[in-house]
Amino acid sequence: MGARLSRRRLPADPSLALDALPPELLVQVLSHVPPRSLVTRCRPVCRAWRDIVDGPTVWLLQLARDRSAEGRALYAVAQRCLPSNEDKEEFPLCALARYCLRAPFGRNLIFNSCGEQGFRGWEVEHGGNGWAIEKNLTPVPGAPSQTCFVTSFEWCSKRQLVDLVMEGVWQELLDSAQIEICVADWWGARENCGCVYQLRVRLLDVYEKEVVKFSASPDPVLQWTERGCRQVSHVFTNFGKGIRYVSFEQYGRDVSSWVGHYGALVTHSSVRVRIRLS
């Protein structure tokens, strides 16, 4: 009979306990965890992990890994303009965590910009037969939905208030003079009826008091002259300290007083925040 081979069991490697790591090394490890998992999975583990997630270091390490021009500029500003302690009831998470979770830069901060969700997110005042939502007459480039809001024969208006801090931009960053706020709106008219359109965008402080304003009142579109949409845009720079809100306000009506919805069409409204590169 052949000899029976014996199998030797190798001793199992001892598992690595993360809580045994030195704090500075644990921060490095946790900084590689995606932001949402860091908050929802790691923060509840223990008090030590919670303190790390609630502190700035782990989030600054995440910002430092973005080597794009915008990422490097933001990291440099963030080191100089660290957020102060905030009201825990209003902001349970630290400001840097909120920034990494919300990723506000480059994202459109206007909710429901094309009416794809009805009038959700908008404060609406109806004139004439009120606002309506229709399909675009011509495609609008980059729009998330090819739909638009349409006004009537009397002035119609709607407004959306964007809370920049709740969207992830902390106050010290807004006050740094390194932030630009870019606003844009698409508007147009039907071919068979002229219209009037106005845009007003106001930067407000924490008490919703106006600090800076941009207004646009393009020439009315006349009947049988053109159809489709065109864009109005503006960039706020050097707007000073204390800005917290953006009030985005649109107004429109037709010029023929026709019953129905023949007034200004508005769509693809946007408010975007970006870092200055120079």
Swiss-Prot record:
Pfam families, alphabetized: F-box-like, FBA
Domain FBA: 99-275
Keywords: Ubl conjugation pathway
UniProt superkingdom: Eukaryota
PROSITE patterns with a match to the protein in the record: FBA (PS51114), FBOX (PS50181)
Assembly, per entry: Part of a SCF (SKP1-cullin-F-box) protein ligase complex. Interacts with SKP1 and CUL1.
Protein name per Swiss-Prot or TrEMBL: F-box only protein 17
Species: Homo sapiens (Human)
